[in-house]
Amino acid sequence: MVGVLTNRSAPPATVTPVLAYPDVRAAVEWLAAAFGFEERVRIGESHRAQLRVGSDGAVVVAEGSSAPTTAPELTKLRVPDVDEAFARAVNAGATVVSELQTWEYGERSGVVADLAGHRWELTQTIRDTAPEDWGGTTVGPW
């Protein structure tokens, strides 16, 4: 975002989800094994951690209840090979919420739940498709 200062103590992403886990260290290890996240900053042994993935993805793992919020949360994680990433997550112990599916809008995705019940949509772009080609409407640029 133009005009926003960066800080070496905070993730540079414009939007950073903060997810609560009962065991921060176990969550960090699991997210690394299942999704390839890398720990960037650790705040205490069990209080909080900042993780990165890819060139611009970030998530904060915070100490807290294992129960996800009552609102339906979903964190979307874009990957280069969704079939491999989905299998990796399941092999690490993720629960399948919805199997992989190829969508008319050019994405292939599936949803898994992690060790604390947070849902992750793993997605891969398989082709560039105009929103108008599948019933959407372009209303502004990215």
What are these regions (language model features)?
Residues M1-A10, T14-P22, R48-G54, S66-W142:
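Vicinal oxygen chelate
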Residues N7-P12, V18-A58:
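Core segments of cupin and vicinal oxygen chelate
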Residues I43-E45, A67, W103-E104:
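A short beta-turn/loop motif at secondary-structure boundaries
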Residues D56-V60, T69, G117-R119:
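Short, charged/polar, Gly/Pro-enriched secondary-structure boundary elements
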Residues V61-S66, Q124-I126:
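Acetyl-CoA-dependent GNAT
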